Amino acid sequence: MAPLRILISNDDGVFADGIRALAGAAAAAGHQVTVVCPDRERSATGHGLTLQTPIRAEKADSLFDAGISAWACSGTPADCMKLALFELMDEAPDLVLSGINHGPNLGTDVFCSGTVAAAMEGTLEGLPSMAISSACFQWRDFQGAAALAVEVATAALRDQWPENLLLNLNIPPCRPEVMGPLRWTRLSIRRYDEQFSPRKDPRGRTYYWLAGEVVEDLESGGDGPRDWPTDVAQIEANSPSLTPIQPELFWRGPLGGLPRLELNGQRVR
C-alpha cells in the first residue's frame, strides 16, 4: 500500500501517551501523519462544539516523533477534526484515526465519548475513520495496541470501507502474545449507578462530582448478527473487539410500536 495521509486526534489531550504511540506507529509504517488534538483533557465531551469562544491552535511537533506535524487545539475533539479538515491541512486525509483512548469505549458509552466523536466527524465528512481505545484506564503500554490499530485500518482500506462506516476498536490491556483473536462485535448496553457527590467550595457554594460506576452490561436488543459477541464480552475474553457503527440514528424497530399521536384532532402520520 502506498503511504497514506493520516489525521489523528483524541480526547485525552496532546500530552497523552496513547496518541503519541498511535502517531508514532503510523509514521513508522511510512505514512504521513498529522495530529490535531485538544490541548488538555477532554474526555466524555461527546460531539460538542465550541461556538461562544474562539478556538486557538498551536504547533506541538516537539511532543511527537520526527516528521509528524502536530497541533494542540483549545477546542473539543470534534472542533479539532473540523479545524484540521477545513483549515489546517492542505489536503484531505486518506484515513482518520482517533485514540488511543486511555480507557474503554464500549457499548452505549460511545454516545458520550469524545474519542468516538472525533472519528465520527471524519465519517460525517465521508472519510474512512476508526476510533481506538485501550480497555483499561491504568494500562500505559500502548505499543501493541498502536500496531494493531494501524494494521486493522490499513487492512480495511485495502478491501472496502463503505460510506458512513465508523470502526470502533477496543483492545484489552495485555501484551499481544497473550491476546485473543480480533472479532467483529455488537454494541452492548451499559447501565450505570449514577451518583453525584455534593461538596462545598471555599465560599460555601455547593458543587457536584459525578461518580457513577457501571453496574451491568446488557445484551444489545438492536441490530447485529446474534452469533457476534458483544464488545464487552469480547474484551472480558481478553480479545480485541471491532464494532461497526454509523451516524444514522433512525429507529429500526417495528413502526407499529411507535406512539399513536393525535394533535388538534388530527392523527400524526
Curated annotation (Swiss-Prot):
A divalent metal cation binds at D11, D12, S43, N101. GO terms for molecular function: 3'-nucleotidase activity; 5'-nucleotidase activity; exopolyphosphatase activity; metal ion binding; nucleotide binding. Keywords: Cytoplasm, Hydrolase, Metal-binding, Nucleotide-binding. It catalyses: a ribonucleoside 5'-phosphate + H2O = a ribonucleoside + phosphate. Disulfide bonds: none annotated. GO terms for cellular component: cytoplasm. It holds the Pfam family SurE. The keyword Nucleotidyltransferase does not apply. It comes from the Bacteria. Belongs to the SurE nucleotidase family. Nucleotidase that shows phosphatase activity on nucleoside 5'-monophosphates. This is 5'-nucleotidase SurE. It comes from Synechococcus sp. (strain WH7803).
